[in-house]
Amino acid sequence: DSSTSRGLGDVYKRQSHINPSREEDSSHLNDLAAVGLTFVFIVGLRRAIRTLNLFPEITEPSLKQYLDLVALGTVCDVVQLKGLNRAFVKEGIDIIAKRQRPGIEGLRSISNTSDIGVTELGFRIGPRINAAGRTGASDLGYRLLTSQSEDEVMAISERLNNLNQQRQNIEQTVLFEATNIVEDEIIEKKLNIMPNSIVVSGEKWHLGVLGI
């Protein structure tokens, strides 16, 4: 296929691509982050299993316990906090406040975060988890959020904190170099009017921070 021909290797092939903003969509779910959409799907799946009367054979899971993760993902995806997104985040923050997930507590401790709200999730907790993926250690976030071991949680939290500092340093270096390139270009071409957009590149710039 096209991805193979372009040397991209194995790429997950989706069966379909659906624009969530289609005019005929009446689900009112088009503003959900992927984590919220996944949660809605799981709720529907549980309902279907209940309809098939399978829960007498297996324990019906309580899904509310996962709303802390839904809230975290929703805030970090920077979607509009209205409707179902707002409800997810409110319920999730209430759960986080009860200190039930060791991984989140580890990050709260390492980042000196006492109060918890949208700002703390978006600027203290989330960036430390995301730093792992941006610096090539994406499994750390999963391990942290699923671990019940205090020692493992603190070890991973410290590593994520260090990776976040590393990410910030890399980001500042890239920004500094990009700014210098732009300034040199303006001087060289004697531009009096700034163009609408400027594209710069660097061979050694870390791909993990270019989207920030």
Task: Tell where the protein language model's regions lie, with residue ranges.
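Alpha-helix initiation/capping motif
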Residues: 1, 27-31, 167
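Single conserved hydrophobic/aromatic residue that forms the stacking wall/gate
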Residues: 1-12
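Catalytic PLP-binding core of fold-type I/II PLP enzymes
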Residues: 6, 43, 78
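Generic alpha-helix initiation/capping and coil-helix boundary signal
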Residues: 8-9, 31, 171
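A generic alpha-helix preference that emphasizes hydrophobic side chains
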Residues: 8-9, 35, 104
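Flexible loop/turn segments at secondary-structure boundaries
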Residues: 10, 25, 206-209
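Short alpha-helices
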Residues: 13-54, 67-70
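Hydrophobic helix-and-loop "lid/oligomerization" segment in the mid-to-C-terminal part
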Residues: 47-212
